[in-house]
Amino acid sequence: EFCQLDLLVDNGWQEAMKDCDFVLHVASPYVSYQPKDENELIKPAVEGTERVLKFAKQSAIKRVVLTSSVVAMLGDANASIDINSNTWTNINAKNVSAYVKSKTMAEKFAWDFVENQDKNHPLELVVINPGPVFGPSISGNLAGASMSMYKDLITGKMPMLPQSSINMSDVRDIAEIHVKALENKQAAGKRFIVTTENPHSFKEMAQILKDKGYSKVSTKVAPNFFLRFMANFSNDIKGMLPFIGFVYNADVSETIKTFDWTPIDLKKTVLDTAKSIDKVLDL
């Protein structure tokens, strides 16, 4: 059964949670550019999380599984770092974007809420921290940031690649861990990273596609000075600048151990994403 709820309005939340034992909170606005007013992202992220937890507590929900992000774990976000369940992003560091602030502040609010709640019928919290999400789409909607970028890549509309690397997350891995997190007793009160352990460059991913016959894919890498120049004309490129040259290794050992998780292979994620887009575009 579907119902429509607003992250900034109380109406309908309690009714939606009636007779439920668990809540998955996966909604939070994302844009690849820096908005003029950072509260466009921060307010719905934090207030939406507050609303979910408040009504979950009132409805005697047993556990909330919250989708956060690895961007809430990046320290000062200006140098290489090893991230784990104990690392947090410093939102006061230089060049921290509104999106990064929104995810970090929303997750911190959630942990504070659970820590300070009335201990009668305590609400349990599990947090999942994915990276950039790829993998096959079940809706056929290519408007999201990851799928839109991927579509441009395989159709030849991305002539040059950013000189950066990412820890990719497969949407199927994320879905699996969310479902397992609902009832796994060992998961309560913990954060779980769901990404590749090591970063992979855009060139590496493009080469996988090229080798599979995607002839329009470019493997040329844009120099950083060129991207900085182009950022004057593109909000999307401007949003990428803080992450150029920034890499991290992710400790996913706790996720593997707790959920008996076998991550989907990078090559499979890359190719299955492309096949999914092929279907939508009828390529």
Model-derived regions: residue spans:
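Active-site Tyr-X1-5-Lys
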Residues: A93-L125
